[in-house]
Amino acid sequence: KRLASESERGYHIELHNPSAMPKAPMMVAAGKFVVTPMKGRIRCAGVVEFASTEAPAQARPLEFIKRQIAALFPELSYDHMSEWMGRRPATTDSLPLIGPARAIGNGHVAFGHQHVGLTAGPKTGRLIADMVSNHPNNADLSAFDPARYQASS
């Protein structure tokens, strides 16, 4: 059986060997994107869309980010630009699936964290380890129960 999830896609552009480098990451509220200085490059990320895992990357989100970069850094030069689109598993209610997945026998799942997977991953890993080891914990995980979707499939 399939669990209810969708592909949440994020886009970013990297400017390699820029003529200037921000001293710290910036969240540009007006442009709705984030600028992150990295070794030898600047990453400009923004735009989220939902699409199937088979759908190709769209040009419009990348063009939007390029316009925001040009507005924020009109004098910036760089060697080259790279474009990226990645998929994150997302549930239809925005809550991750954490717990036993009865549809796959004795298995457990822990996915669908969207943009906070790296942040929530360590704690989620501990919770799943407790579950499969039958170690009790005091966390109420009912909101994350995969059965909320399995019952409707």
Language-model segment annotations:
Residues 97, 101-153:
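C-terminal lid/capping helical subdomain adjacent to the catalytic/cofactor pocket in oxidative enzymes
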Residues 1-105:
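Active-site substrate-recognition segment that forms the wall
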